[in-house]
């Protein structure tokens, strides 16, 4: 079974997200290119527009729908990654997505936007031995609460073994004065 603590070198993740723009062929090509670049994993975003965006925001729904892949397409992508010996994982934007992703991935990433969504974190912790939590925009108190939620929900998981915290600066590109790299030490 995969464990972050068993890694002997840097674990490089290709953040594909929604850069495939809803096109399975583009997503497959991005996995191929990531493999050729020597990464260890590919990461996507998984969502269903109707669970993620209010029905009162039809324009926004229509835009987001163009970037959405079906569950069947995610299964194809997961198999392609595994065939290439790459870890496949995704960021779910709804609890239903977590249930689906459990079937195709043994790692899950919680977005910094969901750092304070403790119900989502609890649900993810129940079904995964490997959680990655992004901390962008989170306060130290919020990060502590998220970590404690994971430990309480799944006492067998440990930081830097099954739980990985990612230092994230939620500004793109990030101004150098806002990088706060010293925070990485605190996260450890």
Located regions from the model:
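Catalytic cores and adjacent flexible loops of soluble metabolic enzymes
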Residues: 1-188
């Amino acid at each position: 079974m995969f464990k972050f603590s068993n890694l002997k070198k840097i674990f490089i993740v290709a953040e594909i997200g929604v850069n495939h723009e809803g096109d399975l062929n583009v997503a497959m090509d991005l996995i191929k290119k990531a493999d050729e670049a020597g990464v260890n994993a590919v990461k996507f975003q998984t969502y269903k527009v109707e669970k993620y965006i209010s029905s009162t925001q039809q324009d926004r729904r229509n835009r987001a729908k163009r970037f959405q892949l079906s569950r069947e397409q995610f299964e194809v992508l997961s198999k392609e990654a595994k065939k290439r010996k790459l870890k496949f994982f995704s960021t779910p934007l709804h609890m239903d997505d977590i249930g689906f992703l459990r079937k195709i991935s043994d790692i899950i990433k919680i977005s910094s936007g969901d750092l304070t969504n403790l119900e989502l974190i609890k649900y993810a912790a129940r079904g995964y031995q490997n959680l990655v939590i992004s901390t962008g925009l989170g306060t130290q108190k919020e990060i502590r609460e998220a970590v404690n939620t994971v430990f309480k929900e799944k006492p067998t998981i440990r930081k830097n073994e099954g739980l990985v915290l990612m230092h994230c600066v939620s500004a793109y590109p990030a101004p150098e004065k806002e990088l706060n790299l010293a925070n990485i030490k605190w996260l450890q």
